[in-house]
Amino acid sequence: MSEPLKPRIDFAEPLKEEPTSAFKAQQTFSEAESRTFAPAAIDERPEDEGVAEAAVDAALRPKRSLWRKMVMGGLALFGASVVGQGVQWTMNAWQTQDWVALGGCAAGALIIGAGVGSVVTEWRRLWRLRQRAHERDEARELLHSHSVGKGRAFCEKLAQQAGIDQSHPALQRWYAAIHETQNDREIVGLYAHLVQPVLDAQARREISRFAAESTLMIAVSPLALVDMAFIAWRNLRLINRITTLYGIELGYYSRLRLFRLVLLNIAFAGASELVREVGMDWMSQDLAARLSTRAAQGIGAGLLTARLGIKAMELCRPLPWIDNDKPRLGDFRRQLIGQLKETLQKSKSSPEK
């Protein structure tokens, strides 16, 4: 017997086709194109550094705003009015032979001249800081360029700005390594590997020294007010040292921008609970159990000082970081913990003697 026919089934939605994977067309490179191929570098940063890096970048990098332009315009108009009024007073004093008023006008002219000179000097320092950012962008373009003729002049300008003498061994090795057949990317890359590490090593030593001083001072100091003053002073000194090493001089306005970040660093130095929690993640449970509250605060303040120095070092360098040569907090962390343990052991052994 034949089976009965099944009733028809009506579906409310149309039949969906199964998605098929789309394959891209094969792409082949010729031998000439493969020689000029350069892989793009991926900048991998830890997630926990995002907020802090943005805060330091905003504090160090000069920026323009509408309010600043309005204030500058008002100051310029006020200055022009003062100069015009001073000229009128001088003419009246000369005509009436009022020598006292004429002397006052001369003193005012000297004060105004000193103020104008300070403004020009401050503008020049801010302009130099902006130029360093432009030089870093230019270096990044040269490191991805295959042109010839710009790399050597650019590197010689950087060496002159940094105060590196022509007879310096690192610069002599760079001159011996370059030749006419190399392009700009190779020349700048050789400079980054042979000459730039000389300045970077000095900056690393300064960061290590200042971070160690902050760690030890806070670990042994019983007064919170002394800790805050010491952190503020050493952080500003560290910024000045790093900028001097890379040939940049900060002005008064730039230091005001940095002071905001220094206050943030001071706040971390006084937050003992937060520092202890962060220290538990960074150190083993055994070591954290042996350290006192002051020692944990010292390590936290030292690491924050090192972070500030690393960011200032990054913004003052004329070249971008390449080949993962950027200093890490872990490089300074082990050194700080070792120095702190050694200091605590010495302090425990001295009363026994």
Curated annotation (Swiss-Prot):
The keyword Electron transport does not apply. It is found in: Cell inner membrane. InterPro entries: DUF697, UPF0283. Residues 1-35 are annotated as: Disordered. It is a multi-pass membrane protein. GO terms for cellular component: plasma membrane. Keywords: Cell inner membrane, Cell membrane, Membrane, Transmembrane, Transmembrane helix. The keyword Transport does not apply. Residues 1-19 have a biased composition (Basic and acidic residues). Its main location: membrane. Belongs to the UPF0283 family. This is UPF0283 membrane protein YcjF. It comes from Salmonella dublin (strain CT_02021853). The gene is ycjF.
